[in-house]
């Protein structure tokens, strides 16, 4: 559970709250726990970076949470630029990771590309880095398509391509301006 400081800024989740023992206690004491078919959590969701700019050491969060869950979703709605500034190395879900996939959790990040990058309103991206329990691409795609519009706005999709190309070609320079 995130915290608020004296200025009302939300986050971060304290490190002890991510530890396996704490998560196990919270799960067993949850009012719906007795109705669950199994007590094994599937996914942890972490807002990284918050609206106020609070971000996590993603590697440390993965190491802690990965002891309890196989999948971590970093909601990085306001953080699509992190890869392009060395100051944020290791602090975003799609960070460079030399660990073998079987030794780390699967990481999903979502970026509301329209918020801080050059994409049209409502444009967003989902990124997946498979780990010890890879996502089934066909199942994921089927679920995604079930919730996507049958009448997509192609200008929004094109703006994602333009934004990606802009950042791919000059993102580091743009982040230093």
Model-predicted regions and their roles:
Residues 1-177:
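Conserved PLP-enzyme active-site core in the AAT-like
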